[in-house]
Amino acid sequence: MSSPAPKSPELSDKSKKYDRQIRLWGEHGQTLLEAATVCLVNVTAVGCETAKGLVLPGIGGFTVADGSTVKEEDLGNNFFLDSSYLGKSKALACMQLLQELNPDVNGDYVDESADFLLANRPNFFDSFDLVIASNLNEQTLLLLAERLWELNVPLIYCRSLGMLGTIRLQIREHCIVEAHPDNRQFDLRLEHPFDALREHLDGTEVTSKVPWLLVLHKYLNVWQKQQADGTQTPRNYKEKNQLKETIREEMKADEENYEEAIKAVNTAFGAGQVPKSLKAIFEDDACEQLNKKSNVFWIMAKALKHFVIHENEGHLPLPGVLPDMTANTDSYIALQHIYRQQALQDADQVYHKCQEYLKQLALPADSIDERSVRLICKEAAGLAVIRGTRIAEEYEKSSRLLPLVEDNELQGNLTAYNFALRAYERFLSECGNIPGECIVEQDIGRLKSIAAKMLSDLGMHATISDDVLHEICRYGGAELHAVSAFIGGCAAQEVIKIITKQYKPIDNTFIYNAITTESVTLKL
């Protein structure tokens, strides 16, 4: 009687609950998410949808700040509110309804407006990892953005008006360790094998049962001897075809590992070099000049640079990851073990250099752990740093804005709508009411004047077309929940990228037109 198959380890309740998202950003990403707290400024449909996209995956906590009460018009704009909350605190209603989605998340609320908090409780925003805001007038937006820039707290500002929506990310510096590139190349180090790999490759007989890596190594050696100029790896289409033919000539029928080796010729070489993006990080002043306030990312980056230049002949640490290969289990596991051991050895050298730097800076040794170093070594080729701009810079003269103007008129393109929404916010500040809420024709004229002055102040010799401004007034400040749901979902995704330090966030503005289903990302 055969023995029963071993059981898979039991998943915890949390792992079962968040299984799909953990597949995207891992247990370590989930841990960062559950440790984060965010603030939602203003209860709007787009704000609630953004918060929903964070509460469902298990954000650590959220606080809602809004000084208004629920009115009849809110019920039509925001599906999160119902008639039972009429006349009650909008912040409380939002907090309670969001918490129902995930009782594991801590919720809080403050019955105060952003203006009041900035004027009377300026330290209110200090403790948050990120702030999400919507439906602010220009003056309040700029005050909030400047305060958060000083605190180095990221801000996601969302707009949803009629069929239009935008997201603006303000972040001082964002260091990305796990960028999750679409086309990741496996670093196999065939052209520069380390000692343990060379011994294994040279000492193993090539049969139909071994991984294709051994097949490719064997016939790469044959091909190298045929090169009069001493070329070590195929550099172009012709040379790659020569190597493929060398393998094909020795292949017997139905040898899958030989077929895989032939296919791998195109992608098996060239990894392990320092890409331009990483060179820029190595040459950055933040990497060159460490101090006690340096982000641990920069300390690890400098240790990584030292390893590459002084200890690894210009090559990156080995990630230690192999692609799937047709082979018997023992031979594949043996090869996998060699790569993993070398990856651990490389990471250990980088870790010890990190500890040296921490000691020099008089920082605690536990500021950087081995797991973090192993991760940055594994992902070294994809490291990225984004340095954002202040929202206030958009309201100052900037050459960055000039290329957005075509033929001296901002027509019905997405850039025009972005400027029109900014004119809408200035209208709120100067006039104290929503354009189009009461006397539409009168408000259109005022909005035109505000838009013209705004563009003139920016040094832009352009106008926003009447059709665009008419459309803004026609919306009368109304949110369409379907548009808000889309913008909120996108914004929540950006928040998660920032908190988990995975995937590249927008840099820095996303604009969406639901009428034409067009979208664009701009750096403003």
From Swiss-Prot:
An example GO CC term for this entry is: NAE1-UBA3 complex
Q: Does the keyword Hydrolase apply?
A: no
Pathway given for this chain reads: Protein modification; protein neddylation
Q: Which domain of life is it from?
A: Eukaryota
User: Does the entry feature the keyword Transmembrane helix, yes or no?
Assistant: no
List UniProt keywords, sorted A-Z.
Ubl conjugation pathway
User: Knockout: what is the outcome?
Assistant: Hinders tissue development, causes apoptosis in imaginal disk cells, and blocks the Nedd8 conjugation pathway.
**GO terms classed as biological process:** protein neddylation
* Entry-linked InterPro entries: APP-BP1, ThiF/MoeB/HesA, ThiF_NAD_FAD-bd, Ubiquitin-activating_enz
| CDD domains, per database record | APPBP1_RUB
Query: GO molecular function terms here?
Result: amyloid-beta binding; NEDD8 activating enzyme activity; protein heterodimerization activity
Read off the Pfam families from this record.
Answer: ThiF (PF00899)
What family classification does the UniProt entry report for this protein? Belongs to the ubiquitin-activating E1 family. ULA1 subfamily.
| Role played | Regulatory subunit of the dimeric Uba3-APP-BP1 E1 enzyme. E1 activates Nedd8 by first adenylating its C-terminal glycine residue with ATP, thereafter linking this residue to the side chain of the catalytic cysteine, yielding a Nedd8-Uba3 thioester and free AMP. E1 finally transfers Nedd8 to the catalytic cysteine of UbcE2M. Required for Cul1 and Cul3 neddylation. Appl and APP-BP1 interact antagonistically during development.
How would you summarize the oligomeric state and partners of this protein? Heterodimer of Uba3 and APP-BP1. The complex binds Nedd8 and UbcE2M. Interacts with Appl (via the intracellular domain, ICD).
Annotated protein name in UniProt: Nedd8-activating enzyme E1 regulatory subunit
Record organism: Drosophila melanogaster
Lineage of the species this protein comes from: Eukaryota, Metazoa, Ecdysozoa, Arthropoda, Hexapoda
